[in-house]
Amino acid sequence: MYICAALYKFVELNDYKELREPLYQTLIANDVKGTLLLAREGINGTICGTREAIDNVLNYLRSDERFADIEHKESPSDEQAFYRTKVKLKKEIVTLGVDWVDPKSSVGTYVDPEKWNDLIADPEVLVIDTRNEYEYAVGTFEGAINPKTDTFREFPEYVKQHLDPEKHKKVAMFCTGGIRCEKSTAYLKEQGFDEVYHLKGGILKYLEMMPEDNSRWNGECFVFDQRVTVKHGLEQGEYDQCYACRMPITAEEMQSEHYQKGVSCPHCYDKTSTEQKERFAERERQIQLAKARGEKHIRDGKLESLS
């Protein structure tokens, strides 16, 4: 059994470049895989390893007083959820593309999972899913609005086009683990919205804490690792993922004539060229050869990025 740990903290890191190598070496020494992002504004990422290994990495982080109170969310995985270990230097730990937004100085009101149902049931509250469209398609909260964004960078434009602080007096937002809402609520506060709320700990904490029979969540939750999706109780979901377009796909979609493992699916069959399909097919062949040898291909096509 492996443990996936999602973590983030907005904190001033003027020496973030110097933090990279010792953090990377700590991950390697403990055989922990995944991606951590470092920027001047903080740290963000998801890692996976054994119980002991994850504890070692968290203890290492918390030995730095700036990370002493860093929170993390855990979920189980039957196998290693990542194939590589990466520590990246970034301009932002989650990319909104608006330099002046600072969650350390202004952020929305946190709402605990056990109080979330009552909040989103209020007809005066506008509930917005701040994730990308392919994430929304897999599952979301009852009554939530889909901004139809392909990246988080598009969210400010959505706000500009569709939200008005004079009209929308109460806004509640949610995302996978909470980090996107740190920035989206900070952005709305700066735009003059007064009552802005966000789900503390994100969807993952809600699915961990709320019994399914008392839940207002419909579907599964997309995660950026080999599990693809998780369900209530953070159990692994039923979706797979298409290598070509990175879209989550159902068992039914895998029965489509347009589905070929590692090559295409109904979402992308008409969007890739013959040359691309041939390249994907060769890559899938190499993956299967590696598996036959009892090895893991360095990248098996499932999404490892954070957005």
From Swiss-Prot:
In its keyword annotation, does this UniProt entry include tRNA processing? Answer: yes
Which residues carry out catalysis? C175 (cysteine persulfide intermediate)
The UniProt keywords, alphabetically, are: Oxidoreductase, tRNA processing
EC number(s) stated in the UniProt entry for this protein:
1.14.-.-
Record's catalysed reaction(s): uridine(34) in tRNA + AH2 + O2 = 5-hydroxyuridine(34) in tRNA + A + H2O
HAMAP family (UniProt xref): TrhO
Its biological purpose is as follows:
Catalyzes oxygen-dependent 5-hydroxyuridine (ho5U) modification at position 34 in tRNAs.
Q: Which PANTHER family match?
A: RHODANESE-LIKE DOMAIN-CONTAINING PROTEIN 7-RELATED (PTHR43268:SF3), THIOSULFATE SULFURTRANSFERASE/RHODANESE-LIKE DOMAIN-CONTAINING PROTEIN 2 (PTHR43268)
Please state which protein family the record places this protein in.
Belongs to the TrhO family.
Full protein name: tRNA uridine(34) hydroxylase
Question: What is the taxonomic lineage of the source species?
Answer: Bacteria, Pseudomonadati, Pseudomonadota, Gammaproteobacteria, Alteromonadales
